[in-house]
Amino acid sequence: MKRMIALDGAQGEGGGQILRSALSLSMITGQPFTITSIRAGRAKPGLLRQHLTAVKAAAEICRATVEGAELGSQRLVFRLGTVRGGEYRFAIGSAGSCTLVLQTVLPALWFADGPSRVEVSGGTDNPSAPPADFIRRVLEPLLAKIGIHQQTTLLRHGFYPAGGGVVATEVSPVASFNTLQLGERGNIVQMRGEVLLAGVPRHVAEREIATLAGSFSLHEQNIHNLPRDQGPGNTVSLEVESENITERFFVVGEKRVSAEVVAAQLVKEVKRYLASPAVVGEYLADQLVLPMALAGAGEFTVAHPSCHLLTNIAVVERFLPVRFGLIETDGVTRVSIE
């Protein structure tokens, strides 16, 4: 019998990342775990619908036995069975992030007995989670270089607070892992600005695009009007395609915040990324830790290691026989497998 790993949910960023990473790693390694003080660092601690959906999804995919799987629970015990590929559908029942649920269960399906398809309904444009286009256009091309083949499709948008969005991912078992080396970003090839609107006047998007174009030379400017029943909502994105990597940044519009202010927030974030020689942005760095650890090698550079990144590394090192090294040089942090 494999040993039970005990985790403190209050460590590091004190949010849902510890739980999601633990679920992924438990499903992959077969090691059971207990986590206490779940989301202790949040204003509303314990499991929310999004986290509970991730737990139930993980349990269904690997036939696990779970204690504490209920709303508001701050303690969870997870003992898994066998991971099985197949077709799965999960509903969050709120505007909680679809992509964070997918992020939890997809790594286990890289090791399943056959191809799988996972569909999640809930929120798609959430300021606290990567949108589907980030997964599709930024993360998945890098996963393919590592040897992980999955394809994410956004079937319907769902903005906060209504939700109602649908995201699906098809994934195949991994044959072998490759090493990902992201040492240099390379020259910028092109930049693309994009605005999504649902139930919001078009002039809002036009002003947001104008703000982006006032700071960057955009090769593409796209405005997408979504059906009104998918909103109300507004998301502004800017994609930076460089020779060795594509990064994508986004901001979700808010009521009573002007289009110019919303877009200016995005401009500031992109300028901060471009001012640093670091290859990956803060959010992408979080996503690369687990696949890199499974490959057993690799490296990337990031401007500053976020609390999310450090927490993710700490959890990975509890489950896998790997050690990460973080070395700061010339204003960036090099993250690698030691």
UniProtKB/Swiss-Prot annotation:
It is an enzyme of class 6 (ligase). The keyword Secreted does not apply. The keyword Transcription regulation does not apply. This is RNA 3'-terminal phosphate cyclase. It is found in: Cytoplasm. NCBIfam families: PRK04204.1-2 (NF003246), PRK04204.1-3 (NF003247), RNA_3prim_cycl (TIGR03399). Catalyzes the conversion of 3'-phosphate to a 2',3'-cyclic phosphodiester at the end of RNA. The mechanism of action of the enzyme occurs in 3 steps: (A) adenylation of the enzyme by ATP; (B) transfer of adenylate to an RNA-N3'P to produce RNA-N3'PP5'A; (C) and attack of the adjacent 2'-hydroxyl on the 3'-phosphorus in the diester linkage to produce the cyclic end product. The biological role of this enzyme is unknown but it is likely to function in some aspects of cellular RNA processing. ATP binds at residues 103, 283-287. The gene is rtcA. The active site is at residue 308. GO terms for molecular function: ATP binding; RNA-3'-phosphate cyclase activity. Belongs to the RNA 3'-terminal cyclase family. Type 1 subfamily. One of its GO terms (biological process) is RNA processing. Pfam families: RTC (PF01137), RTC_insert (PF05189). PROSITE patterns: RTC (PS01287). It catalyses: a 3'-end 3'-phospho-ribonucleotide-RNA + ATP = a 3'-end 2',3'-cyclophospho-ribonucleotide-RNA + AMP + diphosphate. Keywords: ATP-binding, Cytoplasm, Ligase, Nucleotide-binding. One of its GO terms (cellular component) is cytoplasm. Its EC number is 6.5.1.4. Its main location: cytoplasm. It comes from the Bacteria.
